[in-house]
């Protein structure tokens, strides 16, 4: 049972224990009872209950039948080497030893010099080989062999990959090795074999890590290498926090580290703040170093993740590639997204392939072509967009679905005092400052001891030179070297070293000039000793020296920041945040093509002109609907089958007037033969708002607007239809609003919306109007409650005040009739005659106008008429005469060969009329002059 319990113990718990420390885990594991195992002679195990506490232990079975026979075959010698040990204890200790070996010896960097052992060994081996920045390159294979043979007894591929990475400018913010040859690329191309590539130390390595000063005895500790044949440094005396300068990453047992690189100039500045004020707040440090600085540049979005990483050691830094928008075709307004920088550790070729795959899968829309034009001058990935595609939307989708936006998960774990520890920014900086103080103190003590020793010798030489004749006489009077040394010591009170140095002086140094040099040297040594003593006794001087050395590096090697930090509250940018909420025109055709254009596409024209074409229409296609909305609006698409779909207005590609539009089947999940008959823009799904729906056969119903706030991509049912009927008109309304209905024969019913009971989506509704044979519904419009004072009974008093009902016949004739000319009538009635039409003519649309008035009390609205051939005319409503219910009306648009009026829409007037472009001017010149007096034909 103990054996199985030990084997079932999870490895992380076995490693760390309930308290989270290695020592606690070892103590907890040692208290467990487990099996006794004999190794390595055990081949089979059996259980017995011979232990005193009744627990079952595992004992070895004898290989033979007789123990004596086994002993006769050498079993006794083997048995002497069998060491009984508890299985759980051996497993725990062995696993902990392995884990700590990986943690301390391979995977994690030291917080003091910021290097892993393999990096440190490579750099030290290259320095021993004399591969300075001004020396010739040497083969990488030779460096790898040197490292493997002397310091790092592991695989050659691991050493070579580390060497290659230290030479890649897209992996290291400040490369430590200069590479000559193929050292890989940002496209993850592998480097050439080590027998082909060459390397040497980079000039920055000597200054950042102060590797030249490593031979100053006592500055850092040296430890034996793996075979005790020589020694290697346990640390390099780094002058700047190399852990933050180039960052680090590694995976160990039970933990990992991932530290981003930073800018040298900012790092020195933040080090200065930390030295001058150890109690500085994190915000003060962020003012000097706002965040990481990645070698590949890009943009860092937001600083919340940076703040968390610097505070706790863990955080998520969101990165984006650097992009530009270029126009590739001015005439067609086609543009392209140019990727100039990618996020750190992003494979460019994989990114390009992924974008192409998403375009094929139709996850990314609006992209027509993608190609990589990168060369030695820099990165350039061109993403060409389709005509009418919004670059901001496409770019936002690229951020959302590809590695063009990725995150760097900071996990700042490093070795501190022989143990792995998660540290924040202040703790890392403080650990480096303490280490650097120790290095400077040890260096100063070493130099002090050398200066004192040299001064002692120089003082003895000066004494000898001052008594040169006596010295010569003593030397000549002795028979050997030892007697001369003893005589000098006895005569002048010299030490052994002083006497030995005096005896070693050559004759040419006995001149007076040489004596002066020794005197000056003694004086210089005295000053140096004084400075070193002062340095060792004053901590502030040590801090000043640390800062001075770091500042020298900043002045010599600092470069501008590559990664731009963009302030943002959220890294998830919604399309609405980047798209301006502008007024737009949506044009829907009968065959299911939709276009989005700016309102100024159609300039104001006079009543009675031909108009301007809405654009190129496909064969046998006509304009079905024409609305005005905002780009942020939800657009509800109602089909003839009573199904409603939803999409934002900006999802429709913006196009020119001459474009044919975008098929709705590319935007909506329409079934075969399904047509969109009405589109309704919604900016907010209010609880007191409703949608009124009207079918061709005259059925009407009211549904709460919020019933359509969540529409799935496949659509939902909006109304139940009888066979042969279809949904045609949908409008927004409130309870107190009026709804005006008109049939093709000109019959009108005006009633309040509160007379309609709110129904669910899956209902048919009630009959709105009794239609005569051959008659169908022609239009529906809503009159806001704040804009009407309509009496409930008919008044014979002629009142021409607004609002008015604007009637538009399909032959291009229209009129305005005061709303007061109608009385409120119930639904399911024949209605009142609103427009008496000739036999070959029918009513095309009815609008309620007069909501926006000028100073003189006239309408400030405009109406856009669209013919079956696609011709559009935009005119002022005030130019349309006010007539009685029985009058024929005036000419609004001369159709000629344009067919009949297909649809009409009201838009708000601009504050200033825009000047007509040459094209519209030519169209107007072809039209007949507007009549000075409106022709009216009485009924």
From Swiss-Prot:
Q: Which GO cellular component terms, listed alphabetically, does the Swiss-Prot or TrEMBL entry include?
A: chloroplast; chromosome; cytoplasm; DNA topoisomerase type II (double strand cut, ATP-hydrolyzing) complex; mitochondrion; nucleus
Please report any disulfide bonds recorded for this protein chain, giving both cysteine positions: none
Q: Which Gene3D superfamilies match?
A: 3.30.1360.40, DNA gyrase/topoisomerase IV, subunit A, C-terminal, Topoisomerase II, domain 5, Topoisomerase, domain 3
Question: Which keywords does this Swiss-Prot/TrEMBL entry list?
Answer: ATP-binding, Chloroplast, DNA-binding, Isomerase, Mitochondrion, Nucleotide-binding, Nucleus, Plastid, Topoisomerase, Transit peptide
Q: Which SMART domains match?
A: TOP4c
**Residue span of motif GyrA-box:** 605-611
Q: Where is this region: Disordered?
A: 46-73, 906-939
Q: What EC identifiers does the entry list?
A: 5.6.2.2
Q: Which domain of life is it from?
A: Eukaryota
Main localisation: plastid
Q: What is this protein called?
A: Probable DNA gyrase subunit A, chloroplastic/mitochondrial
């Amino acid at each position: 049972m103990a054996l199985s319990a030990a084997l079932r113990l999870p490895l992380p718990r076995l490693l760390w224990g309930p308290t989270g420390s290695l020592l606690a885990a070892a103590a907890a594991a040692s208290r467990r009872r487990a099996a006794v195992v004999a190794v390595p002679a055990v081949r089979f195990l059996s259980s017995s209950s011979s232990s005193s506490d009744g627990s079952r232990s595992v004992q070895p079975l004898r290989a033979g039948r007789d123990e004596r026979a086994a002993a006769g075959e050498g079993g006794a010698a083997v048995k002497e080497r069998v060491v009984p040990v508890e299985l759980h204890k051996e497993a725990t200790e062995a696993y902990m030893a392995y884990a700590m070996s990986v943690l301390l010896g391979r995977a994690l960097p030291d917080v003091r010099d910021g290097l892993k052992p393999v990096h440190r060994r490579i750099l030290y081996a290259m320095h021993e080989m004399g591969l300075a920045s001004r020396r010739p390159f040497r083969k990488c294979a030779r460096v790898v062999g040197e490292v493997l043979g002397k310091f790092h007894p592991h695989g050659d591929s691991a050493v070579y990959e580390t060497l290659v990475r230290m030479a890649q400018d897209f992996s290291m913010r400040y490369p430590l090795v200069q590479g000559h040859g193929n050292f890989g690329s940002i496209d993850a191309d592998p480097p050439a074999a080590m027998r082909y590539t060459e390397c040497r130390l980079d000039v920055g390595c000597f200054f950042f890590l102060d590797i030249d000063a490593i031979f100053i005895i006592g500055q850092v500790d040296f430890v034996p290498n793996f075979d005790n044949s020589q020694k290697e440094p346990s640390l390099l005396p780094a002058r700047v926090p190399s852990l933050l300068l180039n960052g680090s990453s590694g995976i160990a047992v039970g933990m990992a580290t991932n530290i981003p690189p930073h800018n040298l100039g900012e790092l020195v500045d933040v080090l200065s703040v930390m030295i001058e004020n150890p109690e500085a707040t994190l915000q003060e440090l962020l003012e000097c170093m706002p965040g990481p600085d990645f070698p590949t540049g890009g943009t860092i979005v937001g600083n919340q993740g940076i703040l968390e990483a610097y505070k706790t050691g863990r955080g998520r830094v969101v990165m984006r590639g650097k992009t530009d928008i270029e126009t590739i075709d001015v005439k067609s307004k086609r543009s392209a997204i140019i990727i100039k920088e990618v996020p750190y550790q992003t494979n460019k070729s994989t990114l390009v392939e992924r974008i192409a795959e998403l375009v094929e899968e139709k996850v990314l829309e609006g992209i027509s072509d993608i190609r990589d034009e990168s060369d030695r001058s820099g990165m350039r990935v061109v993403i060409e967009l389709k005509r009418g595609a919004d670059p901001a939307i496409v770019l936002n989708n690229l951020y959302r679905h590809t590695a063009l936006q990725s995150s760097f998960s900071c996990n700042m774990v490093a070795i501190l005092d022989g143990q792995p520890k998660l540290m924040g920014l202040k703790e890392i900086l403080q650990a480096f400052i303490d280490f650097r103080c120790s290095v400077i103190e040890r260096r100063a003590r070493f130099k002090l001891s050398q200066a004192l020793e040299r001064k002692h010798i120089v003082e003895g030489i000066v004494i000898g030179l001052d008594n040169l004749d006596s010295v010569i006489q003593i030397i000549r009077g002795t028979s050997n070297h030892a007697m001369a040394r003893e005589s000098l010591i006895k005569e002048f009170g010299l030490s052994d070293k002083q006497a030995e140095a005096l005896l070693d002086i050559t004759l040419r140094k006995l001149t007076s000039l040489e004596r002066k040099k020794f005197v000056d040297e003694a004086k210089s040594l005295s000053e140096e000793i004084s400075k070193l003593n002062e340095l060792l006794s004053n901590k502030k001087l040590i801090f000043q020296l640390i800062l001075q050395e770091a500042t020298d590096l900043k002045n010599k090697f600092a470069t501008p920041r590559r990664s731009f930090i963009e302030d943002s509250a959220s890294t998830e940018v919604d399309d609405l945040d980047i798209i301006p909420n502008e007024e737009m025109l949506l044009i829907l055709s009968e065959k299911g093509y939709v276009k989005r254009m700016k309102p100024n596409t159609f300039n104001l024209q006079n009543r009675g002109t031909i108009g301007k074409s809405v654009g190129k229409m496909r064969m046998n296609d006509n304009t079905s609907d024409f609305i005005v909305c905002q780009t942020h609006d939800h657009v509800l698409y109602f089909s003839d089958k009573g199904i409603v779909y939803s999409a934002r207005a900006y999802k429709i590609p913006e196009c020119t007037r001459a474009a044919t539009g975008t098929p709705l089947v590319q935007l909506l999940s329409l079934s075969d033969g399904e047509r969109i008959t009405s589109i309704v823009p919604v900016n907010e799904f209010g609880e007191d708002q409703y949608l009124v729906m009207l079918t061709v056969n005259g059925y009407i119903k009211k549904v709460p607007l919020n019933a359509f706030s969540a529409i799935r991509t496949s659509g939902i049912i909006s109304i139940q239809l009888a066979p042969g009927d279809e949904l045609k008109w949908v409008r927004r309304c409130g309870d107190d609003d009026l709804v005006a209905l008109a049939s093709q024969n000109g019959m009108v019913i005006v009633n309040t919306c509160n007379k309609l009971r709110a129904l669910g989506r899956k209902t048919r509704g009630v009959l709105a109007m009794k239609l005569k044979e051959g008659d169908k519904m022609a239009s529906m419009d809503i009159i806001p409650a704040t804009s009407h004072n309509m009496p409930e009974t008919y008044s014979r008093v002629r009142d021409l005040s607004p609002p008015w009902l604007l009637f538009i016949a399909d032959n291009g004739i229209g009129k305005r009739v005061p709303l007061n000319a109608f009385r409120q009538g119930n639904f399911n009635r024949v209605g009142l005659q609103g427009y008496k039409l000739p036999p070959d003519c029918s009513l095309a649309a009815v609008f309620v106008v007069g909501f926006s008035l000028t100073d003189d009390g006239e309408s400030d609205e405009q109406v856009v008429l669209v013919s079956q051939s696609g011709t559009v005319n935009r005119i002022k409503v005030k130019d349309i005469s006010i007539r009685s219910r029985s009058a024929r009306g005036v000419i609004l648009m001369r159709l000629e060969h344009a067919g009949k009026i297909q649809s009409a829409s009201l838009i708000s007037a601009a504050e200033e009329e825009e000047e007509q472009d040459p094209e519209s001017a030519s169209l107007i010149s072809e039209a007949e002059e507007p009549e000075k007096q409106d022709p009216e034909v009485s009924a």
